[in-house]
Amino acid sequence: LTSGLQRSDLIIVAGRPSMGKTAFALNVAQNAALKGATICIFSLEMSREQLVRRMLCANAGVDMQRVNTGNTTDADLIELSTALADLSATNIYIDDTAGVSVAEIRSRCRKQKSRGGLDLIVIDYLKLMKTAGNSDNRATEISDVTRSLKILARELNVPIILLSQLSRGPESRTSNGHRPIMADLRESGAIEQDADVIMLLYRPAVYAEAGDVEAENDNTMEVIVAKHRNGPTDTVYLSWLEQYTKFTDRSDREEY
């Protein structure tokens, strides 16, 4: 739908908690890296070890719960070893500095660009980023961050994926099944203005009523492309494999 990740684009991936924002971004980054791209990931919430574990399980098709609890099988270890070899051959650089600023991201990405090239930047996530200023107005801070990142994307000629959390708006919106809209973006004005692409993630199972087994087991992920500066908006349907923290394509598209 978006014709791949376009250079110099600022791409916002947003959703409520537990929608799979980090997993989605890691899947995109990992797929690009396995095709030869050089990726810089800035994780302000999760550690490098946690991200690597997620990527390994997604690539190996191994249940992450078994890895976390130390209950892996011999077959799991073989798959994980193969996945580790594949990932070790990629150019994925993870920076898990807490509270990293836009200025620090700019400096590190410039160095990587000049040293060994750079094809994609992923930042997880917007709320935890610091700005150079000392504004008490969060909307102003968000505006500074998104504008600076858009400038950086153009300067380095690479796409930047920025994760963001949505407000509680979808929780009370029952008429459309709690699907998010752009207005649910926190401090949405600045984000809408600076972003080239805005993707809103939605999983119906998160809002399933207790006891509705079919709804609870629905693994559909809707990627709602709410803004696309250079193309159409639409919804892309994926399958969410929670045990592997992985998304896969699906051939069927369900109307709602």
Where in the sequence are the language-model features?
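The Walker A (P-loop) glycine that initiates the GxxxxGKT/S ATP-binding motif of P-loop NTPases
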Residues: G15
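Conserved glycine(s) of the Walker
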Residues: G20
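Pre-Walker A adenine-sensing motif
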Residues: L1-G4
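Cytosolic-facing regulatory segments adjacent to core modules
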Residues: A23, N27, N31-G117, T131, ...
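Pre-Walker A (Motif I) flank of P-loop NTPase domains
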Residues: Q6-I11, A37
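C-terminal regions of RecA-like/P-loop NTPase motor modules
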Residues: S101-L118, S135, D144-N157, G169-Y256
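Conserved ATPase-coupling elements of RecA-like P-loop NTPase cores
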Residues: K130-N137
